[in-house]
Amino acid sequence: MNERIAILSAYSFVNIIEPANLIPKFLLIGKKKYIRGTILLANEGFNCSFSGSYENVNLVLKQLIELTGSKDVNVKINYSSVHPFQKLKVRLKKEIIAMNVKDLNIEVFKGDYIEPKDWDEFITKQNVIVIDTRNEYEIDIGTFKSAINPRTETFKQFPAWVQQNQALLQGKKIAMFCTGGIRCEKSTSLLKSIGYNEVYHLKGGILQYLEDTHNKNNLWQGKCFVFDDRRAIMDDLSPAEGYWLHR
């Protein structure tokens, strides 16, 4: 019988003074706790996804919270029969999710969360436009019905798309979504900072939506791209056939 592997994804925007100093600590902790995956550290916070036993992934998360001083962490856990990562990587980055917009104050400019249970009703209202903030290769295999595809190759291209599509956005309620929520923290903050008032995002992203709602209204169509060896999951969160790497 295969061991049940926990996959923990978490992010937090928190001021880390010397993030480079944490790299050897988490490499050591991860090795001791048999953790595989990726931990990204930057002055603006941390973004991670790693796998191991349920007890060990939570112990590593606890260390992340304690050593960074974070008080607001977005966390998701799901499960697999095998590790979806090959090894542990701890990296220093300029941004924990790269959008390349200077001086974006996520604490001051925040979009409003829409809970997964309320998402279907909200996005089918009049005067609401739905934007998929992910990249085109992700959107190609699955997205929400009627969602706008900005056709970006990287998230750094999203601000330019916003500038080029102001006529589309003006006067609308703007609902955005991404895989796990972190890109929407920045995309909604960007829109709020340049004057859009009614800006919303799916709390916990697609992954939390699928877990909570089971896609009961079939508004999600296709598969969800994920950044690990599974590469894609179905709407019941099981790995999609034919996408696994390194099997």
From Swiss-Prot:
Coiled coil: none annotated. GO terms for biological process: tRNA modification. It catalyses: uridine(34) in tRNA + AH2 + O2 = 5-hydroxyuridine(34) in tRNA + A + H2O. The active site is at C178 (cysteine persulfide intermediate). Keywords: Oxidoreductase, tRNA processing. Pfam families: Rhodanese, UPF0176_N. One of its GO terms (molecular function) is oxidoreductase activity, acting on paired donors, with incorporation or reduction of molecular oxygen. Its EC number is 1.14.-.-. Residues 124-218 form the Rhodanese domain. Belongs to the TrhO family. Catalyzes oxygen-dependent 5-hydroxyuridine (ho5U) modification at position 34 in tRNAs. This is tRNA uridine(34) hydroxylase.
